[in-house]
């Protein structure tokens, strides 16, 4: 065992039960290597592990030096929103479909993880967005997002009329099916599908991408990540929502605004030493290949 990481958390809820074999293999291997291991409570229950230290995501964030998320990007997003509040590094083993945020190949995960545990890794900070639904005389409803915050109708698709203010200055109005507000991390997710630009992870920028705008002139907008975005609504309907990473939905009531800003904390995401963002674009998303 080395001094880079002493306590390691195992998290992630796989879509297919067969993926639990990766959790169990990882747990046994880490114990054999002499690490202190904390297993997320639900995973320990599903694996029927006895006399094993377990904890919630928050407890793992408080106690562990490294969290290994086993699953796909959805698992990573769900875990990362909580773990980002704590001083913990996060890495993923891909047991999902795309695995854009989960770097480690399940067939070679232990060797790759061994290198990481020996200190051979790349570390980067990914910022989150904080979304607030608020009105002066009402309590705020707050959530966070690693990828994106999306304004959309709640049940039936229809046009939404809204205004966008950036740092309390009017920027534009729009009639569309919604709006995607994305981090650089999320620029290769839903935002990309809607025609948004790809932002490299180190950029301090936020993109605003219209969803099916009823105009010929709407274009994605890139702004500084220090800006605050306010969404205002004229003719309110009762079914508008904002969703965070397509996992958490906050309803918008009449008279309420939506505020979106950069979070005060960030995700400590680590990768194998040979990680390349542009290689990931190529292998995961079919980015253009080299010609020579």
From Swiss-Prot:
UniProt entry tagged with the keyword ATP-binding: yes
Catalysed reaction equations from the record: NAD(+) + ATP = ADP + NADP(+) + H(+)
Listed EC numbers: 2.7.1.23
Annotated site location: Responsible for conferring strict specificity to NAD: 175
Cofactor section: a divalent metal cation
Location in or out of the cell: Cytoplasm
GO cellular component annotations of the record: cytoplasm
GO BP field: NAD metabolic process; NADP biosynthetic process
Activity modulation notes: Allosterically inhibited by NADPH and NADH. NADPH is the primary inhibitor during aerobic growth and NADH during anaerobic growth.
Active site: 73 (proton acceptor)
Entry keyword set: ATP-binding, Cytoplasm, Kinase, NAD, NADP, Nucleotide-binding, Transferase
Positions of disulphide bridges: none
Pfam family, one: NAD_kinase
Enzyme class, first EC level, given as a word: transferase
SUPFAM superfamilies: NAD kinase/diacylglycerol kinase-like (SSF111331)
Keyword match Signal: no
Molecular function via GO: ATP binding; metal ion binding; NAD binding; NAD+ kinase activity
Amino-acid positions noted as binding NAD(+) in the UniProt annotation, renumbered to this chain: 73-74, 147-148, 158, 175, 177, 185, 188-193, 247
Subunit structure: Equilibrium mixture of dimer and tetramer. It is converted entirely to tetramer in the presence of the inhibitor NADPH.
Primary role: Involved in the regulation of the intracellular balance of NAD and NADP, and is a key enzyme in the biosynthesis of NADP. Catalyzes specifically the phosphorylation on 2'-hydroxyl of the adenosine moiety of NAD to yield NADP. It can use ATP and other nucleoside triphosphates as a source of phosphorus. NADH cannot replace NAD as a substrate.
Cross-referenced HAMAP family: NAD_kinase
Family: Belongs to the NAD kinase family.
The name this protein goes by in its record: NAD kinase
UniProt source species: Salmonella typhimurium (strain LT2 / SGSC1412 / ATCC 700720)
Gene name, Swiss-Prot/TrEMBL: nadK
């Amino acid at each position: 065992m080395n001094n880079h990481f002493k306590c390691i958390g195992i998290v992630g809820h796989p879509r297919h039960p067969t993926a639990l074999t990766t959790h169990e293999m990882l747990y046994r291997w880490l114990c054999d290597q002499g690490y202190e291991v904390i297993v997320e409570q639900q995973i320990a229950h599903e694996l029927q592990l006895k006399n094993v230290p377990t904890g919630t995501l928050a407890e793992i964030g408080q106690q562990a030096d490294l969290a290994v998320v086993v699953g796909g990007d959805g698992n990573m997003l769900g875990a990362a929103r909580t773990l980002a509040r704590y001083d913990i590094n996060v890495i993923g083993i891909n047991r999902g479909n795309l695995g854009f945020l989960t770097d480690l190949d399940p067939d070679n995960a232990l060797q790759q993880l061994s290198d990481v545990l020996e200190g051979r890794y790349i570390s980067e900070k990914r910022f989150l967005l904080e979304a607030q639904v608020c009105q002066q005389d009402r309590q705020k409803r707050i959530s966070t997002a690693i990828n994106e915050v999306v304004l959309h109708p709640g049940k039936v698709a229809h046009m939404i009329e809204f205004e966008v203010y950036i740092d309390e200055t009017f920027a534009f109005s729009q009639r569309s099916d919604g709006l995607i507000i994305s981090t650089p991390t999320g620029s290769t997710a839903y935002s990309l599908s809607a025609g948004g630009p790809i932002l490299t992870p180190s950029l301090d920028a936020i993109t605003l991408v219209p969803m099916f705008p009823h105009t010929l002139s709407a274009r994605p907008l890139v702004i500084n990540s220090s800006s605050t975005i306010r969404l205002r609504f004229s003719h309110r309907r009762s079914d508008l929502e904002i969703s965070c990473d397509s996992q958490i939905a906050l309803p918008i009531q009449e008279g309420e605004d939506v505020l979106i800003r950069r979070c005060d904390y960030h995700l400590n995401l680590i990768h194998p030493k040979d990680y390349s963002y542009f290689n990931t674009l190529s292998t995961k998303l079919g980015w253009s290949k080299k010609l020579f």
